[in-house]
């Protein structure tokens, strides 16, 4: 199973951006700010089965390809950028595939109005996109570390949940 989500300035969570079917990722963002503003954008892809590969992401701002910082962890890849908004409206596309049909018909379209703190999903398309603002932060989810202790914790939890004695009721 693949998961794709984004975090803006650690305060806005764009969740459930994964397509209902397939292994492509993407979303279209409309960023609105009348003043010059720098926003930190993190796009995260995760895989829950290690035998699946994560596809790389590309980003375009106002139709120009931009470079994302990429940090590969054990089960996820975090792409990030500090993007300075100069225009009143900045359009950003983050995607794993430049197929116009995917972009227009399948990826979510999201509007982030920083002037009025209004963040809306304009069109979910083939996703279940939702916005959480302000974020009630789950630090592990937004962390850019994937330490062995986190993996050990998940393994222990999995072991306890699959313990045959756990089905006994007394």
Swiss-Prot record:
One of its GO terms (biological process) is viral process. Residues 152-163 have a biased composition (Basic and acidic residues). InterPro entries: Poxvirus_C7/F8A. Residues 145-170 are annotated as: Disordered. Belongs to the poxviridae C7 protein family. Plays a role for multiplication of the virus in different cell types. This is Probable host range protein 2. It comes from Cowpox virus (strain GRI-90 / Grishak) (CPV).
């Amino acid at each position: 199973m693949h998961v794709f989500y984004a975090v803006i300035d650690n305060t806005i969570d764009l969740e459930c951006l994964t397509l209902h079917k397939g292994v492509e990722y993407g979303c279209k963002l409309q960023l609105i700010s009348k003043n010059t503003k720098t926003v930190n954008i993190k796009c995260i892809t995760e895989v829950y089965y290690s035998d699946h590969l994560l596809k790389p992401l590309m980003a375009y701002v106002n139709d120009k390809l931009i470079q994302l910082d990429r940090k590969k962890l054990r089960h996820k890849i975090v792409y990030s950028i500090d993007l300075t908004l100069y225009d009143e409206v900045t359009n950003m596309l983050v995607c794993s595939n430049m197929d116009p049909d995917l972009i227009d018909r399948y990826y979510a379209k999201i509007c982030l109005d920083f002037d009025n703190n209004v963040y809306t999903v304009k069109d979910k398309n083939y996703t279940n996109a939702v916005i959480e603002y302000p974020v009630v932060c789950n630090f592990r989810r937004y962390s850019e570390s994937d330490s062995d202790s986190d993996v050990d914790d998940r393994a222990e939890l999995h072991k306890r949940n699959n313990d045959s004695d756990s089905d006994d009721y007394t």
